[in-house]
Amino acid sequence: MGLEKSLILFSLLVLVLGWVQPSLGRKPSVQDFKRQHMDPDSPPNSRPTYCNQMMKRRGMTKGSCKRVNTFVHESWATVKAICSQRQMTCKTSSRNNCHKSSSPLHITDCRLKGSSKYPNCDYTTTNSQKHIIIACEGNPLVPVHYDASV
């Protein structure tokens, strides 16, 4: 009887760990979005080293150089509010969960220079004000993917 109870408890433990374990160590997509694209505390600036520093600081040059990335210099509330705009088809995929900002936002585009190779990732820094298109998911909707600038 004791062995039977132990086997049942062990089976339940394995089952519970099977459900819980995949979510351990995996960041929610909204956290990835914030890490990769949000920089509300820095105004856009023309420092040519901005992208090199930020891409490294935010972990986008580990193992390889991320080719393109955009930082948004607006509050999280402003960016999150874009999710309440009209839904549209994304520019970079056929998904239909994208939303376009109603006004231009301050952004910095970082593009890997053609001659740059890992581990010496070297980026061009371009500041502008553009509408952004983001993918939103969840309930309530939150940004999970930066799709495009227009």
Swiss-Prot record:
The entry's keywords: Disulfide bond, Endonuclease, Hydrolase, Lyase, Nuclease, Secreted, Signal
CDD domains xref list: RNase_A_canonical (cd06265)
SMART domains hit by this protein: RNAse_Pc
GO biological process: defense response to Gram-positive bacterium
Principal EC category: lyase
UniProt entry tagged with the keyword Repressor: no
Active site: 37 (proton acceptor), 145 (proton donor)
InterPro entries referenced in this protein's UniProt entry, alphabetically: RNaseA, RNaseA-like_dom_sf, RNaseA_AS, RNaseA_domain
Annotated EC: 4.6.1.18
Residues annotated as binding substrate: 35, 66-70, 91, 111
Pfam families: RnaseA
Gene3D superfamilies: Ribonuclease A-like domain
GO CC list: extracellular region
GO MF annotations, alphabetized: lyase activity; nucleic acid binding; ribonuclease A activity
Disulfide bonds: 51-110, 65-121, 83-136, 90-98
Coiled coil: none
UniProt-annotated location(s): Secreted
Reported function: Endonuclease that catalyzes the cleavage of RNA on the 3' side of pyrimidine nucleotides. Acts on single-stranded and double-stranded RNA.
Family: Belongs to the pancreatic ribonuclease family.
Name assigned to this protein: Ribonuclease pancreatic delta-type
Lineage: Eukaryota, Metazoa, Chordata, Craniata, Vertebrata
